[in-house]
Structures are given as C-alpha cells and as structure tokens.
C-alpha cells in the first residue's frame, strides 16, 4: 500500500446506509448538504448519489446513498470529517458508513463537463504492480434513445460480474435515475481488472457497441489505487483483507 502525505490530493467514496425510517430525511437533506459541501474548504469536486440494489443496475435502494469527493489534500478530508456539519450528520443518522480513500492513477473523460482529477499526476498504477488492489470508476450520461439497449446489456454484464474472479465488491450509483449513472468496483488486483476488461468477450462486445452506436453523451473511466478504508460495507470492511498486514 502507498502511504499518502497529508498534503497530497486524494479522492474518497463514502457509502451511507440509513434505517428505512431515515430515508425521507436523507432525501430532504440532499439539497442542503450540496450547498454546504460546495463551501467546504479543500473540496475540489463532489457528487451525492443514489445507489441500486445489489452489485448492478437493479432497482433503486432507498436506504443506501453514496458521496464521491475529490480533495486538495488528505488534511482537508481529515478536517471535513472532524468538523463539518455534513460529516457529523452522516455519522449521527446512518446506521452504517464506509469510507474508502483512493488516489487516481489512470483516467480519461469528464464528469459534468469537468475533469474531477485535474491536477493529479497520472502514474502507471503507481509502480505497485499488477498484484496490488485497484478500484475502477465508470461514469456516463446515457442518451435516452439507447436506454433499452443499455438496460439489456447491463443485465447481462451483471450476471458475468457475479461470477468474476477477483471482484471483491461493486455497486451502481446515479445522479439521475437511468440516465446519469456510475459504477464503483473494488478488485483484488490490476491483473483481475485486465482479465475482465480484455478477456471477457461479452464485456468487450458491449464496450465496442457503445462506441459504435454512440450510447453516451459524456463518459469517464478511471482506475484508482485504494489507500485506506474505515467503517463497514454490508457488515464487513472489504479492503483490509487485500492489504499487507500492518498497513491498513
């Protein structure tokens, strides 16, 4: 695992699970939290996201929400977690929370018209090699006319992912249901990611079709190195088993 200096920029994914009775409040707070986050020192980019059930693009899961954030430094994220009303509210109201800190190593594309990782220095997976764990982020704005084809392809790929060796955890999220979607997946290694991306005929075929038919008006693809995690996701902390003893 790479140890990150307090002044180094980083990204984070926070998953929040609420009790069913807390869902209406979570919905109502989205707008207020967005305004507060927009004024947070050191926060370069953020998106508050709903999530789908299971690992793929299933029905909406109203009890689980996600926040993807990009920070000027680890110190800025530390200060947010220690002093922000938003972070305090998450801790007080969520029945489960998991935060993963990451450093992007390769990416291309845009999210909402901007590069969320502008200012980061790309690296060849930071020299850790193909055996180190990796996070994959995909994000796309789907053209409405391709919605039916996308849903059919997503259902087929979800079946493949369920059997994919090396996939530790994954989820689908979105800003706008069906049309503005993202996926996050945690893999045992970069080698496992490449095995899925390049050896899987069904996945490769879908990727080629999206480009040929122009499914997306905007897309982003990124690989990130997981650095540390806190809390639990569905009752477990999935990153710790992938890191060398004593480094997490």
Feature-to-residue mapping (PLM):
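Short S/T/G/P-rich N-terminal loop/turn motif that feeds into the first structured element of a domain
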Residues: 1-57, 61-62, 74-80, 93-180, ...
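Extracellular/lumenal glycan-associated surfaces
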Residues: 70-73, 188
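Residue-level detection of the helix-turn-helix DNA-binding "recognition helix"
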Residues: 82, 208
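A common structural junction motif
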Residues: 85-94, 203-205
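A short beta-strand motif that forms the metal-chelation/ATP-contact edge
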Residues: 182-186
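Active-site/pore-lining binding-face segments in mid-to-C-terminal subdomains
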Residues: 187-204, 211
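Flexible helix-coil linker/hinge segments at domain or subdomain boundaries
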Residues: 214-218
């Amino acid at each position: 695992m790479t140890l990150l200096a307090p002044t180094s920029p980083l990204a984070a994914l926070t998953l929040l699970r609420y009790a069913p009775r807390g869902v209406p409040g979570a919905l109502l707070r989205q707008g207020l939290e967005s305004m507060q986050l927009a004024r947070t020192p050191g926060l370069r980019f953020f998106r508050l996201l709903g999530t789908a059930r299971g690992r793929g693009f299933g029905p909406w899961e109203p009890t689980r929400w996600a926040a993807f954030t990009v920070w000027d430094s680890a110190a800025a994220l530390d200060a947010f977690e220690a002093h922000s009303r938003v972070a305090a509210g998450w801790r007080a109201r969520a029945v489960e929370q998991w935060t993963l800190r990451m450093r992007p190593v390769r990416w291309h594309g845009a999210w909402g018209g901007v590069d969320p990782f502008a200012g980061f220095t790309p690296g060849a997976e930071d020299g850790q090699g193909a055996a180190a764990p990796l996070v994959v982020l995909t994000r796309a704005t789907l053209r409405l006319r391709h919605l039916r084809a996308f849903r059919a392809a997503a259902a087929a790929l979800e079946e493949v992912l369920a059997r994919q060796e090396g996939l530790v955890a994954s989820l689908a999220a979105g800003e706008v249901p069906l049309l503005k979607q993202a996926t996050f997946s945690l893999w045992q290694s970069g080698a496992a990611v490449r095995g899925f991306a390049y050896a899987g005929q069904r996945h490769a075929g879908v990727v080629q079709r999206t480009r040929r038919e122009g499914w997306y008006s905007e897309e982003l693809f990124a690989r990130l190195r997981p650095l540390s995690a806190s809390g639990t996701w569905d009752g477990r902390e999935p990153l710790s088993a992938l890191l060398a003893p004593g480094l997490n």
